[in-house]
Amino acid sequence: MRISIASGKGGTGKTLVATSLALSLMDQPRPVQLLDCDVEEPNAHIFFKMKQAGSQKVFLPIPKVDYDQCQYCGKCVEVCQFNAIALMKRTLVIFPDVCHSCGGCWYLCPTEALQPTPREVGAVGISQSGSFTLVSGTLKLGTHISPPVIKAVRAKEDPDSIVIIDGPPGSSCPVMTIVDGTDYCILVTEPTPFGLNDLVLAVEMLQVLGIACGVVINRDVPENDIIDRYCEDKGLPILLRIPLKTEIARAYAKGITLVESDPHWKPKFLELYQRVVREVAQ
Amino acid sequence: MRVAVSASGQTQLDELNPRLGRCEYFVIVDDVSGETWAIENTGRLSTGAAGIATATLLHNHQVDVVITGNVGPNAFTALEAAEIKVYTGTKGKVQDLLEQYRNGNLSKASGPNVGPHGS
């Protein structure tokens, strides 16, 4: 079972839901993996005081020029769709932060003057405690293409585990990379026009990708039905409501998960998981 | 020597467009022949790294000096490799900036004056 957690809008509580969901499943017979794929700002590790067992660097290939072979034909410049190579006088200028590692330049260079060389783009850290594993991805400072690091985190997915993937906000490539191939996506939102606006974008993205989803309303207030009306209209299940409460925010701000600060949430998260299992089975 | 000014129009009476990679035109003046003409900045149509595409365009038009407002790190690196000198102004008509350049009143950029714009 692979469950992704997305939101559209940032700061709605994806990590709050992901961490408590993972902790509520500790008694399940299957091991639990929490993948922190919010690689630009990974923070799930703050809630689990675990020692990192290992870390692996993530590399992407970028072109390197051998001037003894280069004939200054400009084929590589013509091929590059990202302007990552410029031919200026007798210099081939390569811009690593613009390169998307497509490989077009070194495949099509007529003299094999361009060769792929590894560029570090991030790291993947693994922490383990009993049957629980936390895998965190970190994008290297100055790098701005996150999907390769997200994919490196997801390469650690264990098919026999319950895999929970905490993703970044938005609805573009990084989020598509975290929801891709998952059995279900939990969308965490808040009852504000901003929460709704970005929720709509995320739902539309999931529909294109054909991934089933349901909604968790965080910071819920009884008199506000802005999200309820949308979900009813779209036939989306509301899986859980987390009320707007100072106590929840206060504990969370100290790095304490919801289920640890208030254990009566544990059965609710377990029910959330069982609901997702039922939704997937349908 | 060819001097190009990033502009919003095609003549010396048009305003400077301070965005190097996204300006509409470059008004080019040839110091020796005194000729003036404009080229469209096709680099601005790039989805990303417009500054690099723009620098390549200026290089292809054998420009020696570019006058603009803002130059980012990638564009600066590309212009440096092309041996194109960068002078920065803030605002005014193309003719005013050319005048300031000739009088030595524009500062030569020794590095990018804005951060990366993303790509």
Language-model segments: residues:
Chain B
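Non-catalytic interface/targeting segments
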Residues: 1-53, 60-61, 80-82, 89-119
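Conserved residues at the C-terminal ends of beta-strands
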Residues: 69
